A protein has these predicted regions:
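Short strand-edge motifs at loop-to-beta-strand transitions and within beta-strands
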Residues: 79-83
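A glycine-anchored, Pro-Gly-centered beta-turn/N-cap motif
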Residues: 89-95
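Short, surface-exposed alpha-helix to beta-strand junction/turn motifs within ectodomains of secreted
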Residues: 45-69
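N-terminal signal peptide c-region/cleavage motif recognized by signal peptidases
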Residues: 17-19
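Extracytoplasmic/periplasmic copper-protein system
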Residues: 23-27, 33, 38, 106-118
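Short, exposed beta-strand-loop hairpins at the edges of beta-sheets
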Residues: 85, 96-110
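Bacterial N-terminal signal peptides that target proteins for export
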Residues: 1-7
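Short beta-strand segments within Ig-like beta-sandwich modules, predominantly Fibronectin type-III
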Residues: 72-77
Length: 118
């Protein structure tokens, strides 16, 4: 019995989409991606679409002068990664994250947020 080409293509596309959805992508962050906040936050929180593997997931935050302001290793619980931040004053903060989901696929990304009236 032969499977028609359209059905086979649909099945392959469906499987590929399911596999891509299994990765841990950033769902939301606090402070929000691209936002401006009045004062430097004491903590950064990242929530992902899948649970994370704590030993292989990380985040690095640099302040307006380019120096790291993340305060040590992030705390990871389920799909949430949190790290304390050292205040570095007004300006643009850069966040770069790397996540390994429990399905062993890695993702990474970066974004900025602003402190003060910029």
């Amino acid at each position: 019995m032969q499977i028609p080409t359209a059905i086979a293509a649909s099945l392959i596309t469906s499987l590929a989409t399911t596999a891509a959805q299994a990765h841990a992508f950033l769902d939301h962050a606090n402070p929000l991606v691209g936002s401006t906040v009045a004062a430097a936050p004491h903590e950064l929180s990242l929530s992902f679409t899948q649970n994370l593997e704590p030993s292989f997931s990380s985040v690095e935050v640099t302040g307006p002068d380019g120096a790291r302001v993340d305060a040590g290793k992030p705390q990871i619980s389920g799909n949430t990664m949190r790290v304390g931040l050292k205040a570095a004053g007004p300006g643009t903060y850069h966040v770069h994250w790397h996540a390994l989901s429990v399905d062993t696929h890695t993702t990474q990304g970066s974004f900025t947020f602003h402190v003060g009236g910029q």
